[in-house]
Amino acid sequence: MKKILSPLMLAMAFASAGSAMAQTAPAAPDSTLSFNVGAVSDYRYRGISQSRLDPAVQGGADYADKSGFYLGVWGSSIKWIKDAGGDSNMEVDIYGGYKFTVGDIGYDVGFLRYEYSGNKLNPSANTPELYGAVTMGPLTAKYSQSTGNLFGFSNSKGSLEFGVVGVVGVWSLE
């Protein structure tokens, strides 16, 4: 009996130690607020330099609610507005939208406004844009369309962009 009881007691001790160490994961927050800041050697947007091949300072803030709604603001130093006769050296993007999933497919719909205070261009460089994206696994397809003139170009209302991006692997530095 002593030989049976010892292994049984040992097994029970290990089982109870494991449950004592198990912890409940913290509940997801109702909302998140995050910030970012950085510097780049050349700020490019859709392949075009926004800083005339010079460095740019950038930063932003994002708020997301667990319901899927989000709002954000992002800014960068720029130079191209001055080249066009304007007086703005700063781009500020204001955006908001709604993200949700159905099964394994993620969706994102939103509105984005590129704002260049003091640009004084006619037509204005300020650009409103609607967008929608679909994500399946590592691939995301996104469609964006301006609802006004695009970055100060006359008769450019309705300009669009479509792109597909994907993750090809995970990298880490040690």
PLM feature segments, named:
Residues 2-8, 13, 18-174:
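Outer-membrane beta-barrel proteins
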